[in-house]
Amino acid sequence: VIIVRYGEIGLKSKATRASFEGRLIRNLRAALGIDDVWRGYGRIYVASSSREDAVKASRVFGVASTSVAVETGAELEEILEKATDYAKQRIKKGDTFAVRARRVGKHSYSSMDIARQLGSRIVEATGARVDLTEPDVEIFVEVRDRNAYIYHEVIKGVGGLPLGTQGRAVALISGGIDSPVAAWMMMRRGVDIVALFLDPSPLVDRRTRDRALQGIARLAGWKHGAIKTYVAPYGDVLIDLLKVKDYRLGCVLCKRAIYRAGKEVAEKEGAKALITGESLGQVASQTMDNLHAIDRVIDYPIFRPLIGHDKEEIISLAKEIGTYEVSITPANCCLGPPPHPETRASPERVEKAEEGLDLENRVRGMVEKAEVLRVEPEE
């Protein structure tokens, strides 16, 4: 059996906890392709003895850790016999070991009784020395009411909240390093995403689109299922934005158009927020003043999970979640800022620059023409 532990879920109210556990069980079934997943108090169990399945389960949002365990009854003698045999198979000559025992429920023995008696039997059976500080092998015994579980490895999980427990948001994906990381961080907090990529063709080649979709496919691997993705034609609108008389506002105008498109998709999909990869001060459009001018274009919440991260931290996380290598393949995600881009745009100045462009209707038309895809996880 695989033991699945969760962290933050255990702090919720009884009703919320039950709801989140149910969602986590459904997500585990989808990720593992195993229907036999059930809950016990404070734990979820999977009918598998595969370490590969335990690793997969550890990559499901909401999971704190997993272990492949041997299940036995809760009688002390049965535990000691099974755990001694288990230890003999895993402790090599010269190894040191420690027994870590814990118990939930009413029993005639304590956790200390298990640790002391099992330790003595393992010493007798293997000749190994006890080292409680830095052992070569740890033998864990977890007694939960009428069952006990014996294991030697704890696989760290991704943590967070079960995907789908916190509603839906539109993730604005550019094809760069930052936006997939931002989307992943919100997925880890339980947010289901719909992706939106604005395709600047013919100003850039096909590689930009391909790179964005590859990044979404990596995110789909974390979802363990397809991500609905809108690919909207942005080239004609972008060309006109680059021609505005107040050319220093180019980056701000571009972002406002992207946000408008995000709002249109959110309304179609019942999403309640947008997700962007902005980091304060990283580029011209991400100064405090410019973000203020950009935000006023829509009335939806905008989640910026990377706002306080520097580039090195973002790159490190991108490598950890597997999106970095696809985000650095050759492509032109952005045509580059205008010479001397404005860093302190006022909302009034930006709105004046947009006059006559009919952006509301043109962006709505872009989204109506969007190609709607189901981006599957990479094999």
Task: Enumerate the predicted regions with their spans.
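A conserved beta-strand->alpha-helix junction
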Residues: 216-244, 329-331, 335
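A short alpha-helix-loop-beta-strand transition element characteristic
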Residues: 322-330
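Structural beta-sheet core signal
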Residues: 171, 195-197, 231, 276, ...
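Residue-level detector of anion-binding/catalytic polar loops
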Residues: 192, 272, 324
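Conserved G/P- and acidic residue-centered "switch" motifs that form tight phosphate/ATP-binding loops
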Residues: 176
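Flexible helical/loop "lid" subdomain adjacent to adenine-nucleotide binding pockets
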Residues: 56, 333-379
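Active-site adenylate/phosphate-handling loop in enzymes that bind or generate adenylated species
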Residues: 117-122, 126, 154-166, 238-239, ...
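RNA-binding accessory domains that recognize and position tRNA/RNA substrates
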Residues: 1-170, 180-228, 296, 344-347, ...
